[in-house]
A protein has these predicted regions:
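Active-site and adjacent substrate-binding regions of carbohydrate-active enzymes
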Residues: 1-221
Length: 221
């Protein structure tokens, strides 16, 4: 982001002249709006999304209510057209594996993937996270992909595949629906996705006991 704006404008024109649907992704750690006005980048890496995920599920430093507040802020940082292309990530080649961050807690990993794949934006899966690959900082997070089924967490892989299929089948879970967090229980992260013709509810139970959620409360939210 130290490169002049005019360079990126010329870069975009050159790239799009070769491939009209090329996806131009930038890496910026602060307010990215100056690069996201339609003449430079299509999206940037959504680090505020990752930060909120880690604070909630890995570090346990925020409550579900605070998580909802942070994610709502993430959602409203940019216009909806920008959010639809947002590069939502839960790990990369520069960070410890999400499984390692969460102390190998697979229940938390499933919950994180549920949020990732029902949130507005472009979900990014770093290779191996979907089959339970672990690892600390580089080089631990860059180990080779284990292709054999016996070396993969097949239950986690099945969970991720089912979420991907849900996102494909129900566009309201992708980018056609608005997103609204609703707080009715201190142990549950809840939000709804709503479009002109569809409505979906996402509930993440962070407690140890089962929960009952009233749809009437959702409708009145």
């Amino acid at each position: 982001n130290e490169v002049d704006f005019d360079f990126w404008r010329d870069f975009r024109k050159a790239v799009r002249s070769e491939k009209e649907d090329a996806y131009i992704l930038g890496e910026i750690w602060h307010d990215s709006m100056p690069w996201l006005r339609g003449d430079q980048f299509d999206a940037v890496m959504n680090y505020p999304f990752l930060t909120a995920i880690l604070e909630m599920f890995a570090k346990n430093t925020i409550t579900p209510t605070q998580f909802a507040e942070k994610m709502t802020k993430v959602y409203h940082m940019y216009p909806h057209t920008v959010n639809m292309a947002a590069f939502n990530l839960i790990g990369s080649h520069d960070t410890p594996r999400i499984l390692t961050e969460c102390a190998n807690n697979l229940d938390k990993i499933k919950q994180i993937f549920t949020i990732l794949l029902t949130f507005t934006g472009t979900p990014c899966l770093y290779y191996g996270d979907e089959i339970g690959l672990d690892g600390e900082q580089d080089p631990g997070c860059r180990k080779c992909m284990p292709w054999e089924d016996e070396n993969q967490d097949l239950e986690l892989r099945k969970h991720v595949k089912s979420l991907i299929n849900l996102r494909k089948e129900h566009k309201v879970l992708a980018n056609e629906g608005d997103l609204l967090f609703v707080a009715h229980d201190p142990d549950v992260v809840m939000y709804k996705r709503e479009s002109s013709d569809s409505l979906a509810y996402v509930c993440i139970n962070l407690g140890k006991q089962s929960k009952s959620i009233s749809l009437e409360e959702w409708k009145n939210a």
